[in-house]
């Protein structure tokens, strides 16, 4: 019985890792043993940062909404509370986009929240 060799399988596996390591500095781009470690760490970073990106964008939207709302003598928390009391369901991404690109409709939202806050106060 002939010996089973893994030449093609190993070559393809090495090629896949070295392709992922393209653009790395030093031996990490062409030495398989180092490249596999660097690629694995890079994939861990990308996995982690895909989750962090969601947090960072939510924080950015909140900052933009807060800055826009403060022009109308409100705080972010008052604005969100007013939206909930007025039964307006607009997500933060859309509100931030309105605040930056469509100020007229954002002002309308602010007025609605002020009215709903005035009713309860």
From Swiss-Prot:
GO molecular function (one): rRNA binding
Membrane-spanning regions, if any?
A: none
What highest taxon heads this organism's lineage? Bacteria
Q: Which CDD domains does the entry mention?
A: Ribosomal_L20
Keyword field contains Nucleotide-binding: no
Q: GO terms for CC?
A: ribonucleoprotein complex; ribosome
Alphabetical UniProt keywords: Ribonucleoprotein, Ribosomal protein, RNA-binding, rRNA-binding
Q: Name one Pfam family in it.
A: Ribosomal_L20
One Gene Ontology term from the biological process aspect of the record: ribosomal large subunit assembly
User: Gene3D superfamilies of this UniProt entry?
Assistant: 6.10.160.10, Ribosomal protein L20
> InterPro entries from the entry?
Ribosomal_bL20, RIBOSOMAL_L20_CS, Ribosomal_protein_bL20_C
Which family is it part of? Belongs to the bacterial ribosomal protein bL20 family.
Q: What does this protein do?
A: Binds directly to 23S ribosomal RNA and is necessary for the in vitro assembly process of the 50S ribosomal subunit. It is not involved in the protein synthesizing functions of that subunit.
- Name this protein carries in UniProt: Large ribosomal subunit protein bL20
**Species assigned in the record:** Orientia tsutsugamushi (strain Boryong) (Rickettsia tsutsugamushi)
Q: What is the lineage of its organism?
A: Bacteria, Pseudomonadati, Pseudomonadota, Alphaproteobacteria, Rickettsiales
């Amino acid at each position: 019985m002939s010996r089973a060799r893994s030449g093609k399988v190993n070559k393809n596996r090495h090629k896949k890792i070295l392709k992922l390591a393209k653009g790395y500095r030093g031996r990490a781009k062409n030495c398989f043993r180092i490249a596999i470690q660097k690629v694995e760490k890079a994939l861990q970073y990308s996995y982690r940062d895909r989750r962090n990106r969601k947090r960072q964008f939510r924080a950015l939207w909140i900052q933009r909404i807060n800055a826009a709302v403060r022009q109308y003598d409100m705080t972010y928390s008052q604005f969100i509370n007013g939206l909930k009391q007025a039964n307006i369901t607009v997500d933060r991404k859309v509100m931030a986009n309105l605040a930056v690109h469509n100020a007229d409709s954002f002002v309308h939202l602010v007025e609605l929240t002020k009215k709903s806050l005035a009713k309860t106060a």
